[in-house]
Amino acid sequence: MGLESSENATGAVDQQERLDAYVAGFVDGEGCFHVALQRNPSTRGGWQLVPEFRVSQDAARIQVLYLVRARIGCGTVRENHRRSHDHTYVLIVRRRKDLLQRVIPFFERNPLVSCKQDEVVTFARIVRAMERGTHLRPEGFDRLAEEALTMNGGGRYRRVHRQFTIQNPQRPHAEHGAPIDAP
């Protein structure tokens, strides 16, 4: 009987490891580790860094988002682009404590296979620097913003506005009229 109990415990551990590997693989294909640069007039420089982990999925497979949320232990599932009619949902985690204590450790234990793992490393470095208050000093904010703007292939708006934003963070929209970062 003792052997059977031990085998069940080992089987449960194996099942959890396989489930975590599934979640990591799913996120590798459908997830995003992102640090937005958002205008915020109430901050000293008029801008803020907003780290976010997100995973999207069609409404027919929304249960996978709930599985990911259960495995990482945090996040909110909601409609993706509420004005859109594409019937997709998204799991979003923005709370820094959850990113630091749940999301980042999960993906450090279960690294992604693709080059997206580089985004995880950069994301973790930025979020940890923010936790230390690096973004509260102008030179620290500029360094983290520059690093954030290199993530996710530069993004459409990021490529266009990157240099202008870093050189003049108070007025990046004055001449261009486009958002720095569109989700």
Where are these regions (language model features)?
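Sequence-level preference for short, compositionally simple segments enriched
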Residues: 1-183
